[in-house]
UniProtKB/Swiss-Prot annotation:
It is found in: Cytoplasm. Its main location: cytoplasm. This is Asparagine--tRNA ligase. It comes from Mesomycoplasma hyopneumoniae (strain 7448). One of its GO terms (molecular function) is asparagine-tRNA ligase activity. Coiled coil: none annotated. It catalyses: tRNA(Asn) + L-asparagine + ATP = L-asparaginyl-tRNA(Asn) + AMP + diphosphate + H(+). It comes from the Bacteria. HAMAP family: Asn_tRNA_synth. Belongs to the class-II aminoacyl-tRNA synthetase family. InterPro entries: Aa-tRNA-synt_II, aa-tRNA-synth_II, aa-tRNA-synth_II/BPL/LPL, Asn-tRNA-ligase, Asp/Asn-tRNA-synth_IIb, NA-bd_OB-fold, NA-bd_OB_tRNA. The gene is asnS. It holds the Pfam family tRNA_anti-codon. Keywords: Aminoacyl-tRNA synthetase, ATP-binding, Cytoplasm, Ligase, Nucleotide-binding, Protein biosynthesis.
Amino acid sequence: MFQTINEISIHPELYNQKKVLIQGWITNIRGNLKIIFVELNDGSSFKNLQCVLKKEFIDFDKIENLALGVAVEISGIFSNTPERQQFGEVLVETLEIKGNNYNTNFPIQNQEISLEVLRQMPHFRHRSRLFRAIMKLRSALFFEIHKFFRRQGFINFSAPILTSNDGEGAGEVFIVDDENKDFFNKKTTLGVTGQLHAEAYALGFKKVYTFAPTFRAERSNTRRHAAEFWMIEPEVAFFTLEQIIELAVKLLQKVIKSVIIRNKDEFIFLEKAGDKNLRKRLLQFCDSQVTQISYEKAIELLLEHQEKFEEKDLFFGCDLKTEHERFLTEEIFHMPVVIINYPKNLKAFYMHQNEDGQTVAAFDLLVPGIGELIGGSQREVRYEKLLARMNELNMNIEEFQWYLDLRKYGNPGSSGFGLGFERLLMYITGIENIRDVIPFPRTNKNILM
């Protein structure tokens, strides 16, 4: 019966002076002719397990191929060592090499290797200490998000990946077809959002959410953009703008705090490697009231510092750039901030039109270091208003008739938002490039493997 490093590290006292059997990969090796110290990781924990090989028990001639990256199976006696920094070590009785290196130069020779270098080998980078921490937190965050929605009474809804509708209207889509170019007999793309379909399911289930890959053919080669990424998109019938903002803030604060509590080792490592105040900053947000301002007020505040921006052309109706969003969160409020009531020409066609005729009931939640993290709105439920807006934008009404029809039958209105999973992970880890928080990144001009 094999044990995992995670099982042993949680309750090392239960395994003290007992025989254990472990499978894993060598992450560090050092020693001399009489004793060898091997650090092992099996993927179950961020922590490594130190294994001690003594010549009196192990034939060193049979393990001369031991090296970084080699897969091994060991058995031996575990000793709990609370007086040391490590949780314990194993005095190895048997060691069997299960996966050798064909080349002694395993790509991850240095555990402190930079993220820039690791990007060139996405199939190996999870075996570095830094990327292991990021991926462990990614998995934990994934789980906490699903748990949050389950506890809030949401239904998980699987929106289609293939669609004939561009829900964002930006035209940045990947076209899908077979070699004969006639598979669907109409233009079909990879989905840019699951929102439109989620709206349909909210009318019946009330509270639904999607959590799935999203595809956008954006040619923006920035540290925040990817062609394939994951989106969390809840949709709630009967909800107003204020209620959906409250849900968005609650989601962030709950899942961030839970991830911090349950993943102490990863955060300690990340703080040593980068932001020393990472947890302090995140917990401050979790325990604070989030400031909410109008788009108009945001423009006024930014105009007071106009000379500090590369993009100085600020006016009512301009699209806020990342530098503006970050300035608001980092220099003015020093915290995440919610901006509401954007000009309708900056937002998608489906958003509720306010009485002023100029703005829509939309919101963006901005965070330090990134800018926009969440974008959402109250949806336009008035059939004629929605139709007029679609005509104004010269949209194909026939393609979206099903969406219009949702307004005809028992529609009380709904609200929802989209949260970029990778951007949230960037915020939580302090990692500055989206390519470093996703296993196999797909970006403009780049698709390794």
